[in-house]
Amino acid sequence: MNFVIATRRSKLAQVQTEIIIDLLNKKHDIECEKLLIETVGDKILEVSLDKIGGKGLFVKDIEVAMLEQRADAAVHSMKDVPYEMPKGFEIIAIPEREDVRDAFISLDNIKFKDLRKGAKIGTSSRRRAAQLKLLRPDLDIVPIRGNVQTRIEKIKKENLDGIILAVAGLKRVNLDHLITDYFDTKEMVPAIGQGALGIEVMEEHPKKELFKDLDHYNSKICVLAERAFMRELDGDCHSTIGAYASIKDNIMHIIGIFERKNKIIKKEITGTKDQYEKLGISLAEHILKD
């Protein structure tokens, strides 16, 4: 059996797809090949994502490939997937999640707490920028885009004191040795679905059940809880929004942030994990009442 898996062209996206292909090979006797696609979000690098507009900038072109039957499935970073799935598509599986934290990479291995006043920090994320300002109001936030390697190179090219990147991506491309500091999830709440990969298929695909074996239940319901929070607030990856759900002894804890009326609101909620979607919605409702 031969499967075509669509993904973005970046090194990170290809590595993530190879992770899924390896998992598939361990479970089933399946030959897989990658279909590399340049998405709208990959093509327009000189403009910040929130100014390009729209949701699903990194997934729509890939969904077209599945619609045209050029691909059987797609692998995405779940933080790039809008909460509203197009008709006929579904996330069939979310494998075990990687480290959800954000990392700080500095020019000369200077710790975040030791940064000079007015230090220049690169990030294209409104979520990260807002939380950095809460931690250090003096920081100068510089928007940067590009793949992981490109952003790391911009530290020297653009005379930055450091940048913020997801730990998961750095680990997957073997660049985590460059990390200067790790942010705790309470001081830098991650993006919705950060560290998680999702396998997208068309609902009518005859072989879609093969991917279900790759599903990691606790990882999946944590991501679904975060996405319920995002849906209730009508957020996306361009909003100042973040959430992280974790499970211990069947109890789910969610921390979430959202910018409302020019104020960053942070709330937490705890409950049984079988109520994961209700917990995400309730957390959003608490924020809207603030």
Swiss-Prot record:
Xref: Pfam families: Porphobil_deam, Porphobil_deamC
InterPro entries assigned: HemC, Porphobilin_deaminase_N, Porphobilinogen_deaminase_C, Porphobilinogen_deaminase_C_sf
Transferase is among the record's keywords: yes
Gene Ontology biological-process entries: protoporphyrinogen IX biosynthetic process
Coiled-coil intervals: none
Cofactor(s) the protein needs: dipyrromethane
Cofactor binding summary note: Binds 1 dipyrromethane group covalently.
Function: Tetrapolymerization of the monopyrrole PBG into the hydroxymethylbilane pre-uroporphyrinogen in several discrete steps.
Protein's name in the database: Porphobilinogen deaminase
Gene for this chain: hemC
